[in-house]
């Protein structure tokens, strides 16, 4: 892809002070999508504001503002990204008690992370002014997702805000949709900005963000990808499986779309951007500080970094750091923060140097080596399913809970999902890294990690028809030293199998890293060397150029997350790293299979849930007036009953006999076998009248014992003299008329014949 000075700008001034630019996204036979950026009409007091439209129906406002004074006490860039979902965007009133928007939804939080990850590294190093990006969803076509539109809107508003920002950043979702016709070479087409309906028929989809570099190529900055819920079904039907090679093709397919979006933003900025202001920058350290720290610490630090154990290594590094800071404190009085930052930088240089030149890592492993693995199941006594997965010092406890489908999470957001049957929650307590900190509601990082593990497992979960349960999976990070999110995937697979969930295939995950630099080769020549690392440590994650997490089965990828600091990764390097990840995943799956290979028997503490189908026109009869019938069944059997609009009935109970009793009662109403003359029942008197007693034989099926039959041959003046409501009465069906009305006679339990047959006197 090359840039040409003759390229015509897409930006125009539509009215005084209002500018817009357009990016046309051509999907061939799948049609064209239009992304339009407009500025100058809304939120004019923000440093930069842009309204982004997708096909004129979906409308997002992004406003970027910056603080006036720097927060020089911070040692990080204070960027905040917020996504505000407005329910009026979908023509809805919020479902909360106060009927207004409250805390952000999970979708909004995940979108914040999608925006933050590519935007943050695009700002100049050393910036300490607070920058806030607020994206408000004003209108949403229900067939579209807004998250990738939000990435572009946030980038565009930041690009024109006069900030030291090296954008623009383009974001696109591409989905691999299988070919339906005879020509299926390549397995399908990567479609940009797919609709919700198109995603339902896709094999794989990914959100990719990047920017155009000087060469005209697109540097990928962030990837969030997943296999779809129907991937196994589609692959069995002949669709292309989302292997590592297919994923790499998808990244290449996304680049032209990202380039168009970046150029539309750049065109808008050329007309409407404010001049870049001068902001004070606070470099982490001065050159003199770095030289002093390097000279004082390099030799000892190099030895400390070869210690294999995390705690022992970190204790030694902390000891060296304190000694160096004490030694240099007088020379650099008042610059203690610079000393700490320089020490970190020297550590980073040594870690990378050891990897690139020696081919060894700080814990002594080779580049593709995995740490010691351990897997066991059934570690929490009363849990429905549990497992403990360890990879080196990373330790994850997975716990599964099963319940009725009615316990599925109800989702009140702008997304197409209204309920979640599978819920994955990830907890990262401070003790997992040997620290103290806040414990309580999950932070954005925890929500993001839980969502990644959830996406990795959804493709292999059984359907609701095959397994009629709501499933809550909790991942507890008990120890952390590298990729607890991928450890959560492994622990969750084990825990789900232990709970008896019939997964379509086991899933494992691994975190990969990439380190690159210009080095001198054996011939004395300079070359750029790329080294992929398997199963990265926390330090390698922090000091590397790219980290990506890959989860999947033995056959294909189910989820992928990638973040890189490089301006482009050669495709062969990425393909090699993905292949390396596949080998590691297979090794982990082998270890997991030794712990548990097939679903266990369900825990005795888990509810037994059965799904049955009844005619839709019988739902009212099963429920009864004011819920009388269903409440009676629940009371009699102790089962929980949930009825869907399509006639699916979920029956749950703590034991099998209770569930079966409830099912029999429901079937007796909804799928009745008509009773026959001569059948006997032990019924309950449900009503008395002047002419007889009504006896319930089955739920919803009553018969009448005439007053003349109640006296055992003697005349009865009043029905209540013989029976009352609630009494048990053994009866036999004497007759069923053509309208289905049942006539009953009492049965003497000690005799073979009905009691009323002996004397027929008094019959009216």
From Swiss-Prot:
Residues 607-666 form the KH domain. CDD domains: KH-I_PNPase, RNase_PH_PNPase_2, S1_PNPase. It is found in: Cytoplasm. The keyword Metal-binding applies. Its cofactor is Mg(2+). Belongs to the polyribonucleotide nucleotidyltransferase family. This is Polyribonucleotide nucleotidyltransferase. It comes from Nocardia farcinica (strain IFM 10152). The gene is pnp.
